[in-house]
Amino acid sequence: MKAIDKKIERFARYLQRQNNLDHIQFLKIRLGLQVALGNFFKTIVTYGVALLFHTFLYTLITHLTYFFVRRFAHGAHARSSLLCHIQNLVLFVALPWSIVHFQVSWTFMIFVAFIAFIIIICYAPSATKKQPILPHLRKKKKRNAILISICFLVLMLFVSEPYMQLIALGMCIEAITLLPIFFSKEET
């Protein structure tokens, strides 16, 4: 990992020199590159494991639902990169596989989706210390999180099993990250 960090550092310095950037701008670029590369590797690992377990489509549906709601609702993050990898594998590979394999009832998953929707209404958007939400954006993000959730609830009525359950799972995973129990007093 240190070799990758050195390459990122070198590339960020190159961009700093080429574009005459100050130190703060350099730090932002370096952080952006680190986050982008880290997310790329997490995606490769998650979807690679999903391919190995023949759950690629299930993982994709659950992950996309989660992503589209999270885009506006925000929510808690894993405490470390390793924990993030583990959570990704459990939440986006093992859980979708379990829902399909054990044929979780669609009525139960609709109930779960409505509970998730209520949590989204109550707690979205949920800012963190590292990702604060500007006050003038809060209302718009809340509205968009609710609207995208309604779209998914309606979509659930028109898709077959197990896709309906996977959409509900994606909403539920995101809703759980909004709960106040995941935020310390200093984080909010």
From Swiss-Prot:
Cellular component GO terms, alphabetical: plasma membrane
GO biological process: proteolysis; quorum sensing
Bilayer-spanning residue ranges: 49-69, 82-102, 104-124, 163-183
Keyword Acetylation among record annotations: no
InterPro entries: AgrB
Keyword Nucleus tagged: no
Top-rank lineage group of the source organism: Bacteria
Name listed for the protein in its UniProt record: Accessory gene regulator protein B
Organism: Staphylococcus lugdunensis
Family listed: Belongs to the AgrB family.
SMART domains reported in the protein's UniProt record: AgrB
Membrane topology label: Multi-pass membrane protein
MF terms in GO: peptidase activity
Keyword tags: Cell membrane, Hydrolase, Membrane, Protease, Quorum sensing, Transmembrane, Transmembrane helix, Virulence
A Pfam family the protein falls into: AgrB
Function per UniProt: Essential for the production of a quorum sensing system signal molecule, the autoinducing peptide (AIP). This quorum sensing system is responsible for the regulation of the expression of virulence factor genes. Involved in the proteolytic processing of AgrD, the precursor of AIP.
EC number: 3.4.-.-
Subcellular location field: Cell membrane
